[in-house]
């Protein structure tokens, strides 16, 4: 059983805050607040924020906020982390208030990705969530969305998230090019088909992409139109093999991607693990040379959906 119930929020560090402010509104975020240091707090629902954009200059993932159900779950997670030899920092009230939670702890995964766990996310139903483009996101018991990260050691990362945090494996993907095989794992802790995905590889940054899910297909399609009209680099629509998302990938002002889509399937606890050799049923073509994954080599098929036509399928983000 998972000790965490979803990713409640993430923090990203950026080098171009004004560009992010315009970009965030284009894809439907409500800017809830601006911190004293310039941090943008982006809203997707009744929570105060789900994404914090910090002007750190690093253009990468800064932290991941894992939600636990209550104080008992919070204490159990602390004990489990310490028993596994993971250093834990218990944050004070001021830090918890800054994150908008009741209690907060900090730790790192095996690759050094800064992680936080909390319970009691601040909810503001008295302050209506108003997207500038009337976008409604799927959140609640499924968390804010999913993240895909690059890690140092695949097996060590798998053990940590499965044995310590208690995530379940939803599916595995093994793809490659030029004789180099890449293993990708997709893990869940709630009905969302995956909250976390990762593969091992060399990269100057950790974050490949994070995913936002809309309530309707039209909301996804209209956001794609706004990106095209606004000159924001994006792929076309496609559908993934594992979570069935109809989605597209956007290049953010920081260079990493956002997957933006609809129709992610929900799974139950006894869902069997699947293995795939491709990432998309159709679509997700790169447009104007835009690559939506750090792992996509030049010899890739034009579309991930065409990977079954080549001898060795090509790694791509899901």
UniProtKB/Swiss-Prot annotation:
One of its GO terms (molecular function) is catechol 2,3-dioxygenase activity. Residues 6-120, 143-263 form the VOC domain. InterPro entries: DiOHbiphenyl_dOase, Glyas_Bleomycin-R_OHBP_Dase, Glyas_Fos-R_dOase_dom, GlyoxalaseI/FosfomycinResist, VOC, Xdiol_ring_cleave_dOase_1/2. The keyword rRNA-binding does not apply. Keywords: Aromatic hydrocarbons catabolism, Dioxygenase, Iron, Metal-binding, Oxidoreductase, Repeat. Signal peptide: none annotated. It is an enzyme of class 1 (oxidoreductase). PROSITE patterns: EXTRADIOL_DIOXYGENAS (PS00082), VOC (PS51819). It catalyses: catechol + O2 = (2Z,4E)-2-hydroxy-6-oxohexa-2,4-dienoate + H(+). Fe cation binds at residues 146, 209, 259. One of its GO terms (biological process) is xenobiotic catabolic process. Its EC number is 1.13.11.2. The keyword Oxidoreductase applies. It holds the Pfam family BphC_D1. Its cofactor is Fe(2+). Belongs to the extradiol ring-cleavage dioxygenase family. PANTHER family: GLYOXALASE DOMAIN-CONTAINING PROTEIN 5, GLYOXALASE FAMILY PROTEIN. NCBIfam families: 23dbph12diox. This is Metapyrocatechase. It comes from Rhodococcus rhodochrous. The lineage of its organism: Bacteria, Bacillati, Actinomycetota, Actinomycetes, Mycobacteriales. The gene is catA.
